[in-house]
Amino acid sequence: MIRIVPACMFLSLALAASGPAAAITRTYYLAAEETLWDYAPSYPINPMHNGKFTADEKVFVAGDQRTRIGHRYYKARYVEYTDASFTTPKARPPEWQHLGLLGPVLRANVGDTLKVVLKNKTKRMPVSLHPHGLLYHKDSEGVPYADGSAGQDKGDDIVPPGGVYTYTWEVPERAGPGPGDPSSIVWLYHSHVNEVVDTNTGLVGPIIVSRPGELKDDGHLKGIDREFVVLFAVFDENKSFYLDKNIAAFAPAAARRTEDPEFMESNRKHSMNGYLYSNLPGLTMKEGENVRWYQLALGTEVDLHTPHWHGNTLMEAGRRLDVLNLLPGTHLTVDMQPDNPGIWMYHCHVNDHIDAGMMAHYTVLPRHP
């Protein structure tokens, strides 16, 4: 007797044989390091209008030794290294140059495990690592508080200057894209010893989690031509670990003005990835490409952001839009297929944030030059 085997059974057997993408452990080596950061390297020119900064704009970028620090500040950031010796920084690929102040992208598929070896290379600042969204146990939370843990479970709380600690984070299904999400989503990681101080000092970065099988061997997503990660944040330098050092270096006469409202306002940097007034580089794509944007926010009550792209539209969970809503600590993933070549404005639509420089350009090159 000849049995007829349905074609769907062959397909099922083939899929079972191939199986899902194998879960792996991905290891990253990050160092927290002091850096001299420039919020507006184009100064004295504002790239948004290609003219000199106006008097109102100079409040946020011009230093004068007496009343304002300016556009350069000592900060801390996460820097990726090639191995546990922490001797050779890993070069940031051109496609991620737009990350600016942010730490490196940590990638994982659902089912993977992330091991992040953190070395504190600052001289005085205690640091840690805390992820959003992922599964971690008490020895890898990265937050010091009265949680009933003890012994080895407290080693993650604080990494002192010169110290090294390995954080282990799992990526279960509940940390990955949901039913209505695209093939990848984004989470934040940041230092959490003193979250307000640590994040305003600059210790923050992105985690991108994709569905199994969506990440190619070269580290790029299937079906996506370009990815951009942008953090909208008013970095409050008044609350930075390095405030005193910045005053001493760039505005020594302002040492007695730390409670002055005008001085404090000049230290609030309305930034996109740590850049003001269209200094954010690298947001370039081609007409018709599949472009994924990961949008992040951190901060306080002033960090209510509405990212807006001129010239093109995006899709979020089946909805067409050109403006998003971001609250502090939120993460959004949206897709764009640009059909309108040109150099376009990309900014927060909150008026006060526009005035203070929370804006950038993105460029869509024509499909056929």
What label would you give each PLM region?
Residues P6-A16:
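Bacterial N-terminal signal peptides
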Residues A22-P369:
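Copper-binding active sites and cupredoxin-like electron-transfer domains
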Residues M1-R3:
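N-terminal secretory signal peptides that target proteins for export/translocation
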